[in-house]
Structures are given as structure tokens and as C-alpha cells.
């Protein structure tokens, strides 16, 4: 039973990488969204409002022009390795690998760390405002001040929280398995 739950948990964690994680909004209108894979690859999808502004142009500007989120990339590697070990454990029928909770914990910490430090698109927005020169007299040092002045919000979509929850499940299972009976 534990092997099945571990497999489902890691498969779900991999699936949540395809869903939108981060939504960058300006004046409460979605400008760019990024899924987990897009944060790793350095891409993004233009929001509805941005698509109307751009018109018929492809969103090539957001593909490959952003830096990759390295912590998320290593977290994705942990999820893929965990899924592989979960499949081996499921097919082998033996006890679950003790590496599964460690891989889940590592991916959980790395994705959480990336959320805390900010995604590369956030730094790119700050750099673009500094390059365009928001007036030299008004030097905006803090990112939160810039975002407040320009009405920019970074909204984490529910899929990123589901990702963290699915990675937390193997850790909980490991702690429950250690409990004396």
C-alpha cells in the first residue's frame, strides 16, 4: 500500500509541473504565467491582456528569453528520480525505498527556497524597470516598493501548493512508518 501511495504522490508531483505555478499580474490583469516546466526551461505564456496587446505576434519573447529557475530544475530531477524509484518499488513488491522521503524533502525544500528567493522572471521585471530608468532621482532599491508603485503582483497558483502537498505526502508516510506500534 505504501508503494502505491508513493507512486501516486510522485506521479502527481510530476503532473503538477505541467500546470501554471506563477502568475505575474499588472493592475490585476494577467501578463505572464509560468508552469513548473516553463520556470525550468526559462519560458512563459502571455496572459489574456498581454495577448491582446501583442496581437498576432507569437510569444517568442517569453520563450527562451528568461533565466531558468535552477532550484526548481534540481527539484524536478528529484521528482523524476523519486518516480523512477517508486515504479521500481511498485513492480518489485519489496519495501519502499528509504530514498523516497529524502528525495521528496529535497524537492520540497528546493521549490520552497525558489519561492522565497523569487523566480527569475521577477528579477527580469526589476532589471527591465531599472534599464528603462524609472527616473534617476527616484532610486527604487526594494523590489516590493517597485511592485507596489507599478501595481505588479506575483500570484502563486493553486498547482504549486498541490505540488508541495504531493511532495509532503511521502515524508508523512515515512514518519508514520517509523512510529512504534
Regions found by a protein language model. Name each.
Residues 1-181:
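Compact integral membrane and secretory-pathway proteins
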